[in-house]
Amino acid sequence: MKNDDIAILVLSIQRKGANKTVRYLERNNFDDYTVMIPSGLDDEIAESYGDHAFVYDVDEMKKKVDFMGTDIQNGASVGRMACNDWIRTRPDYKMAVVLDDDYGGVVSDYTTVPTLNNRTFYEIVKAVYKLGKDLGIITGGYSGGAHPDTKKNIMNVWLIDKDIEDRGLNKILNEDVCYSIMCWHRGKANFGLGNVLRSGAQTAEMEKLDGNTKMIYQTDRSYRKSFGSVLADPRNAKLAYNSGNIKRGALWHHKINWADICPKIILEG
């Protein structure tokens, strides 16, 4: 696969000047990118990106998204569905990297991989994509739920292609985790791209502990909350709540039994 076969898609509802990911893309000479913008916003937002903008029909995408009986219509899940449709109708591309508009660390010169640049970014993406295809892994990662009552957002890094199933990309908040656990039970791992591409600047997140209390803990959002981190060290799973331990690893929305979620590709490979 050549670099030209890979599209870069950025989910955004902001004008260009406020889009951190686009700022870093342009700073590091990533000229070929598309900003996925939901319909119903001010025309000025799409206009600020010029030819890089693609406005998708929110209502059409929502028809395809399964919200598991909830009323939470998460913008990220709808946006990812739009990316699914986009890549399927683009014969010039074989796959796409989907980024959140505040995930500039992946393509910036401030990442935890200081040598990351245009060339190495594509090489890493291609290597992880090939690994996922060879092993039947859904390649993607998210960090979300920090402010579920106000933002209802998910931070995205996903690798998608024309073969990806809609249902695999339309989960929201806890349901992302539920979907991942379901896949692991069936022998398919959900691997966080944040394991190899992550921003050291994402060091604080808030977890709602009860109706009124929130606590800030230090973590690398995309890695420490990914299944890859649990795969690397089972102790990263949230086995029990410990209010005195602010470095207790990945804070899942469910208690996890490591033996139950070990993927069959590890146990039987």
Q: Where would I find each of the regions flagged by the language model?
A:
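Conserved catalytic core of nucleotide-sugar-dependent glycosyltransferases
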Residues: G104-H185
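Active-site-proximal specificity loops/subdomain of glycosyltransferases
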Residues: I37-Y93, G104-V113, N117
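Short aromatic/hydrophobic "clamp" motif used to bind/position activated sugar donors
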Residues: A96
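Catalytic metal- and UDP-sugar-binding loop of GT-A-like glycosyltransferases, i.e.
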Residues: L99
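Short, hydrophobic beta-strand segments that form beta-sheet elements in well-ordered domains
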Residues: I8-V10, D32-S39, G136-G141
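Short, well-formed alpha-helical segments that are part of the catalytic scaffolds
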Residues: V10-N29, I37, L41-A46
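Well-ordered, non-membrane alpha-helical segments in soluble/globular domains
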Residues: N19-T21, V78, P114-L131, Q218-K225
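C-terminal catalytic/acceptor-binding lobe
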Residues: D4-I6, Q14-K20, K171-L173, V177-G269
